[in-house]
């Protein structure tokens, strides 16, 4: 179960573009990172420009006021190659939604399975599954 937070500046995107951004992120996770269909949990936050603080040229990128921060909490275990492909696919998909590649900042936060409760106040994975680190899956 990836949990995705997208943060962007107020007034820089339309509702249609935000939907396309969310769809592009989700599609990349399903196609590249082996996230199951219908395993979709996303939050889009629009914040005032005054509350979106970033270095516009850090590491040689040319970030604009339309920068998009993407933070994904997901089960641990994907390879560096899968992560690299995921980042590239997200940039491609978001590019189709009108977001410049230099304006995309992605952060993956890998979690152990025992750190998830999908509801009911219960550990969502059986103890045997929670104690092992997966190589694929959400």
Predicted feature descriptions by range:
Residues 1-138:
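Interaction-mediating elements
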């Amino acid at each position: 179960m990836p949990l995705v937070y997208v943060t962007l500046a107020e007034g820089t995107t339309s509702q249609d573009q935000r939907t396309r951004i969310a769809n592009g992120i989700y599609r990349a996770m399903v196609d590249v990172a082996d996230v199951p269909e219908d395993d979709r949990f996303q939050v889009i936050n629009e914040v005032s420009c005054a509350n979106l603080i970033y270095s516009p040229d850090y590491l040689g990128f040319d970030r604009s006021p339309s920068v998009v921060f993407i933070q994904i909490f997901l089960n641990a275990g994907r390879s560096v190659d899968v992560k690299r492909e995921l980042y590239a696919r997200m940039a491609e998909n978001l590019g189709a939604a009108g977001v410049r590649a230099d304006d995309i900042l992605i952060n993956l936060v890998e979690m152990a399975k025992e750190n998830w409760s999908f509801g009911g106040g219960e550990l969502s994975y059986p103890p045997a599954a929670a104690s092992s680190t997966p190589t694929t899956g959400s």
